[in-house]
């Protein structure tokens, strides 16, 4: 009996905890191509993390280089200090990169249309998130509608699906799910402001959410902190 041919999909792979988890979720049912973005982020260690994660599961990658630092206004792409030990979720933080997920999904959509791929996975999360408006279900629904209205290849019977399997999960639930899927979280990088040798600061929003997630899940955090 021949093996069932899997559909193709695109996974936006940042190298972080969430994207590593959705990669393993997607691999259960799809042949995956990972899109990795070098967008001028200060935490470039996530790029090498993403490449390593993709290498481990032996999937093709497409590295896309864009310079969001040209626009600034974010602590991740501009000469702005990354906030530490602040209350998360009170307001949209300075680590928000303007229109980042719209840009990333647009690149993914272009790659999808050229390669006739109808499924895109992104690891946005609306519960344990830092107040980013482009991580909300409403944003994803709006983008998916736009994608199906504005592309040639979606005018037939098959439609584009933006998959967000983590959107209603807490960080602890994500970690528990990924652990069951054998995600190696030691390979992932979350920190917004790592040391020169890649150690995580332990105090930025991303580090706090990560540490709290592992603690709540009752799983040892494999991250190397300063």
Predicted region positions:
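Serine/threonine-rich low-complexity intrinsically disordered regions
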Residues: 1-2, 67, 204, 221
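Non-transmembrane, interaction-prone segments in cytosolic or luminal domains
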Residues: 65, 122, 185, 192, ...
């Amino acid at each position: 009996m021949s093996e069932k041919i899997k559909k193709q999909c695109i996974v936006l792979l940042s190298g972080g905890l969430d994207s590593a988890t959705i990669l393993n979720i997607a691999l259960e049912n799809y042949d995956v191509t990972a899109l990795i973005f070098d967008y001028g982020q200060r935490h470039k260690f996530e790029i090498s993390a993403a490449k390593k994660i993709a290498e481990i599961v032996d999937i093709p990658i497409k590295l896309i280089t864009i310079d969001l630092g040209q626009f600034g206004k974010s602590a991740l792409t501009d000469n702005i200090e990354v906030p530490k030990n602040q209350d998360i979720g009170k307001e949209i933080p300075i680590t928000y990169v303007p229109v980042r997920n719209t840009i990333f999904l647009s690149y993914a959509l272009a790659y999808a249309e050229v390669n006739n791929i109808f499924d895109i996975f992104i690891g946005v999360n609306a519960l344990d998130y830092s107040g980013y408006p482009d991580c909300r279900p409403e944003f994803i629904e709006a983008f998916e509608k736009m994608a199906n209205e504005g592309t040639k290849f979606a005018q037939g019977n098959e439609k584009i699906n933006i998959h967000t399997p983590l959107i209603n999960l807490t960080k602890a639930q994500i970690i528990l799910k990924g652990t069951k899927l054998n995600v190696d979280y030691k390979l992932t990088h979350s920190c917004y402001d790592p040391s020169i040798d890649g150690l995580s600061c332990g105090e930025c929003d991303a580090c706090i959410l990560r540490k709290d997630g592992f603690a709540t899940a009752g799983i040892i955090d494999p991250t190397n902190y300063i």
